[in-house]
Amino acid sequence: MRTFPLGLAVAAIVCFPTLISHAAGPPPAALKTFLEREGFGGSPLQRRFGNHLFATTIINGRRMALAIDTGAPFTLVDSASARGIGLRVQQTKAHITGVTGLTERADAASIATLRMGNCTFLNVPVGVADTAEINAVRGPHLDGLFGAHEMSKFGVVIDCARQMLYVNPHGASPAANQNLAQFLTGRGFSRIPMRFDASHHLEIEAKVNGHPVAMIVDTGAATTFLPAPVAYNSGAATSGVNFMMGGATGGALPAKIARVQELALGNLLVHDAELTIGESKVGGGAGLLGEEYLSWNFGIVDVGGMNLYLRPPESAPRKNR
């Protein structure tokens, strides 16, 4: 999760979706086929150590990798990577703050072309800041974060488990969102409304042991997180495992592993849920719904339609660390 107050807009996008027949026939069984019929373009995602989903992109003709981060309000390019591709960086008075509380200055720039899969974003305004901390773990180098602002504008759908990102070249479409809702709920998914909070984070209502709590849908968070006061007030029990939790924009936060008897996400119930807890420095008491539970429960994040879809595994052992 990051707070990032720059006011940005994306100019345009061009997609070349897979050509398919629209002749009458049985409804598609796969989400990929369904979204292609709806006109979406797609980009495969990869997962690196640390549980980060990322996309290989071409930015201004250079191959780069961006983390897919619904917890980032806006798209952010690392300052070193921005220099490497010759971006013109404009200094601002804006700052970004991560869950650890560390604040970094954020400047602004514009990307002429950002190609992701068979879609090309044109004239993309981005923030520029030091995100070197995200590369503290081993694995492919990440050059920044693809954030919620661009996802919302172009109706992005993220399939967390199958590691795909889809873009609607016509922007967010109520008709496409409704068709997607019917497709997924007809296949056993629970639909959970999302909203933007005051800091432009995607948020859902959840319950921890029956206690209401707001949770930010954060594909950039490796694990699900609760602020310690919220966790303890909800009856969380710590396991005795302590560690230091890092953030994409730097800093470290003392954290613990805890369990709660029940985590309710819409109609989906996770029993004996394992969580990370710590003294969050931002977010007004909101937790983070991280990538492990999103992928484990076949999470589909429809940013254009402002809905999260989850379906529990048919049979799975308790999540083990």
Labelled PLM ranges:
Residues M1-G7:
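Positively charged n-region of N-terminal signal peptides that target proteins for export
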Residues S21-R321:
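Pepsin/retropepsin-fold aspartyl endopeptidases
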